[in-house]
């Protein structure tokens, strides 16, 4: 790898994440020459499997599917996999090619995968399909990741580099906690779920121009301009961690109301208001996704190296990589048809007209995913080493107009407002109008990370400990009785059963930690790395799922490698705690074997 490519991939944040994930040693690259062109080719192949370790929590399964949850929009994955069953059996590969001529080069990375469990096995509850899905969310596929050209140069003995093409740019000092300064590239969530996942598999490169130039021997300026917008890849519906309604192509999972209304569906169709009713209820159709535009995403950074500390200042204007959910109320033609069909329904089955009217308003409405544009981010960071040898980093980020998701139950109930006199939901609604799924708020986040190496601990050559804590403040939140943000729909609407908690709070915080022991040459040249990870959301509920009070997770594992070529990894992850934790029944074991060459 050249100096430029190392900058592109192993920035301080990526290095910290590599330590945090227990990244294995680098592969033995194949080096070659074509005349004066120097080339390297890296390859990694692996097989792996993951097993679910808990039965589905009935409180997280909708009532229509035999549970006690107030929504069925997130239970397909729970009902598709039983305790002890594999939810992934995968073969995958990733390859890096770099060609360099002097100070100029090309870097290309590609990956492919085939999940035998998801692709070839029958599912107990609902089939898993690749139709209409993003490539990264499919059960099998292949992708070109990075593909950029670069050039290194010097101006007055001050180094500079430029890159153009699909690439990853990492800023800030965050290691574990999201919503940080490091928000330039979207994430492939599906890739990170796969056993044996590497960091480079889950970061989505985007076409952009990037430049870095030294102004003095201590001051550097960087900047980027993205040539396209891309979105985060979400888990496919029906998979172990998937949500039924969010991924591309998952269009029929937003079900509400009662399936008992099905016999009256032909009556609605006769009045020109057809609706789809399944065993899970009335389907709210999915409207077209409202993707962000390609233009308008850029940022600049200044880095200053003091005697013992590096400081950074950042500004970005970017479009959201993760979607918000909104709804669109049925139009005037639907309202005009209601009196006639309600009268006939009551004649056929006294008292059924009200249920039919609600079902028609729900089934003739829509939901849509929207990616808000022009989010501004201001940030500052530092990185230093304490006298104890502990690496200490930190950052603060401020978004004056960050989108925060409105409670989705209120958005669904807003579809009923035209026939409920506005009493169904606090959202103001008119026929045919959008119920925007977010509001812009001031969001400030402060976080700090400590990393320390302890030599000769418990017989290991080294113990690495990384800890990170963050606090988030959301400004301008309305009174909860007027408008709510966040909380999964499975917990019901505001006030259901007297429950008014679990919504986004003005302040929230939590911390993450990871410890790794390094045992070299334990048996016949095999190196072992036992590791322990811990996550705790201490207080409050963060915007867009960032923190969830009381939620905890612990992961225990061991990584092994032989001659930096053959690898193995085994881990157990347990989710627990918190009154609104939808991961409580998603405990799993992951096992993988790999070879690097």
Predicted region positions:
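Solvent-exposed loop segments that connect transmembrane elements
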Residues: 57-78, 119-135, 185-194, 237-286, ...
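Membrane-embedded beta-strand positions in outer-membrane beta-barrel channels/transporters
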Residues: 40, 92-96, 146-148, 208, ...
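Outer membrane beta-barrel
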Residues: 100-251, 510, 539, 547-552, ...
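Short loop/turn motifs that connect adjacent beta-strands in outer-membrane beta-barrel proteins
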Residues: 28-41, 54-56, 97-106, 150-163, ...
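Transmembrane beta-strands of outer-membrane beta-barrel pores
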Residues: 47-53, 103, 112-116, 166-170, ...
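Outer-membrane beta-barrel "beta-signal"
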Residues: 585-597
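Detector for outer-membrane/organellar transmembrane beta-barrel domains
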Residues: 86-88, 316-318, 323, 393, ...
